[in-house]
């Protein structure tokens, strides 16, 4: 079954509100064909459609979806692709403000841990897809799924590394153990001003097709109807790409 919800690091439950602040403050016309422009980086509608297609293809190939994918599921998956970009910008800015550097080695360590964990989760199925597909499929199977496409797993790993760095920095300043669940409220209090500051500094424009800011809930809510309908050709292309990667081994 296809799900889509926030990042895995459970201690950071303030993320949704901070992202909402970031998206609500940015207006102006969208560039033609753009799904979002985050920190000057343009993501096209076509890119988002391809990402959604790859998720649908992956879950259908592995028999996770009963029946057709609904408009609500498509909308959630499309919004999830944009949310990941906003999360990346937010946590990158927070890390920059704190003077923290997250290296490619940090990203690789995070991604390696994800792959090891998720391949173990899929082990009973003898999953033979790529490492990125393994992470995306395990995500799709979980009840706390974030709508990962295989192609966005490296971005997701980078976000996790950024979150870990910022959380650990704030925990050290407050003399708290970040792994102790009893410290979650205090960590939330420490993180809130850092994220609010970062949210006010990043530049985000999101096409209303993917949702809007709901001031009453401080959340970015998806559009009621989904216009994201990957064509049969797009889904077939995603399937062919996955089959080709399976034949080449993991990566």
Language-model-derived ranges and their functions:
Residues 8-11, 79, 155:
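Alpha-helical transmembrane segments of integral membrane proteins
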Residues 19, 33, 88, 154-155, ...:
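A broadly tuned, weak detector of single residues within folded domains
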Residues 29-142:
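N-terminal targeting/tethering segments
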Residues 50-77, 152-185:
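Well-structured core secondary-structure elements of compact alpha/beta domains
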Residues 126-174, 179, 192, 205-209, ...:
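Proteostasis/folding factors centered on peptidyl-prolyl cis-trans isomerases
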